[in-house]
A protein has these predicted regions:
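Non-catalytic cap/lid and distal C-terminal segments of serine-dependent acyl enzymes
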Residues: 1-286
């Protein structure tokens, strides 16, 4: 393997061993690529990946809940499969009947690996990334796969910037998702990102701290559940702790915890099993 191969391998697996299915998993899930035509992005086709759980093909009348997963920046959708190994977690937990199966959907939230969109609706009408996820991707997945096409069967999660995106999208669309997870996400949009331009009003409209009190009555009524964590030395720890306090003040069900460490892939890998179980336990099943 040459230098380029080593670099590609590291970027794909982040220094961890490649995923390997346990021997007892006789019917692993399948990974599919989906192109979504997105009105929210000016009609462009945007890539997403879908992981269908073990047994999906063998149970043609069964419907499945969906967990939408948003990558960080810089990032790519397949990091959830290659690095976090959520596909193997899905197969392992469902094969041993420790958790119900989920369809995993991983959209690509940018126009390139190093272009930053924060999973939010920007100034340009061709840069409405929150609507891309909550409308275009959700509609495409519901149309093509045997999902539970309601909020009761949908969760949204993300790591790092994707964690911010998951919470921000859920607050903008409080009737679309019943479970919201943030893995080391932040709670304040970055004012230096070009997506929002110089519009302070747009920044405020994408600030979860300001959004939460406005939509809290809807979240309480629907029982939307927030599950999120931060590393003990993560620079976003205080933001997350404050957000947990506000959720408690608003009477919204949630679980927030801190794990030892910083803002690392090791934390996200080690917490992925618990994240999957938290979603699978609360999402409706067909």
């Amino acid at each position: 393997m040459g230098a380029r191969g080593y670099l590609d391998n590291f970027l794909r697996f982040r220094g961890f061993a490649p995923p390997r299915e346990p021997a007892f998993v006789t019917q692993p899930g399948t990974l599919q690529r989906l192109l979504v035509r997105s009105p929210a992005l000016g009609g462009r086709k945007q890539e997403a990946y879908v992981y269908l759980p073990s047994g999906y093909a063998q149970h043609p009348h069964r419907r499945y809940p969906v967990l939408y997963l948003l990558h960080g920046f810089p990032g790519r959708p397949l990091a959830f499969i290659d690095t976090v190994q959520l596909g193997i977690i899905d197969d392992t937990l469902t094969s041993t009947h420790r958790a119900a199966p989920l369809i995993l959907v991983m959209p690509f939230g940018s126009t390139g690996t190093f272009t930053d969109k924060e999973w939010a609706n920007g100034v340009s009408p061709r840069e409405h990334w929150a609507d891309f996820v909550s409308r275009d991707v959700v509609n495409a997945v519901d149309a093509r796969y045997r999902t539970i096409p309601s909020a009761a069967g949908r969760g949204i999660a993300g790591l790092s910037e994707g964690g911010y995106g998951a919470i921000n999208i859920a607050l903008h669309h409080p009737r679309e998702f019943s479970v919201v997870e943030s893995w080391s996400g932040y709670q304040r949009p970055d004012p230096l990102r070009s997506l929002f331009g110089t519009r302070l009003q747009l920044l405020a409209a994408n600030d979860p701290r300001l959004l939460l009190p406005r939509v809290a009555p809807v979240l309480r009524k629907r029982g939307t559940y927030f599950w999120f964590y931060s590393g003990s030395t993560d620079r976003f720890r205080l933001q997350n702790s404050a957000f947990a306090h506000e959720l408690a003040r608003q009477g919204i069900p949630h679980h927030y915890f801190e794990v030892y460490g910083g803002h690392t892939w090791a934390i996200w890998r080690n917490s992925a099993r618990a994240a999957y179980i938290a979603a699978a336990t609360r999402l409706g099943h067909g």
